[in-house]
Swiss-Prot record:
GO molecular function, one term: rRNA binding
SUPFAM superfamilies: Ribosomal protein L22
Keywords: Ribonucleoprotein, Ribosomal protein, RNA-binding, rRNA-binding
Similarity-based family: Belongs to the universal ribosomal protein uL22 family.
Subunit structure: Part of the 50S ribosomal subunit.
PROSITE patterns assigned to the protein according to its UniProt record, in alphabetical order: RIBOSOMAL_L22
Gene3D superfamilies per UniProt: Ribosomal protein L22/L17 (3.90.470.10)
Name of the protein in question: Large ribosomal subunit protein uL22
């Protein structure tokens, strides 16, 4: 049974989050949580929250066992970009791009939805 969790408009660029996501793709959930807890990046905290949400969804909605869950799909898409200006010398201004991302985690315990 597949269970999905999403975090939209995460305040980190998709490029930075993908570095962390690539570490845990295809791993068992307990191992992935262990890797994320020792990864020293802001994106690791964001991804860990989404993964824990997916696990809670699987446990509550589908009655899945946490130890059997595996990350089947995990991907990061670009979100909307907020445009800001930074004043510079001689009356000029630079554009600052505050990038966001959408993090999606899909976990599965290996059973099909029709097996119930």
């Amino acid at each position: 049974m597949e269970t999905i969790a999403k975090h939209c408009h995460a305040r980190s660029s998709a490029q930075k989050v993908r570095l962390v996501v690539d570490l845990i793709r295809g791993k068992q959930v307990p191992r992935a949580l262990e890797i994320l807890s020792y990864t020293n990046k802001k994106a690791a905290v964001l991804v860990k929250k989404v993964l824990e949400s997916a696990v809670a969804n699987a446990e509550n909605n589908d009655g899945a066992d946490i130890d059997e869950l595996k990350i089947t799909r995990i991907f990061v898409d670009e979100g909307p970009t907020m445009k800001r200006t930074m004043p510079r010398a001689k009356g000029r201004a630079d554009r600052i791009l505050k990038r966001t991302s959408h993090i999606t985690v899909v976990v599965s315990d290996g059973r099909d939805s029709g097996d119930e």
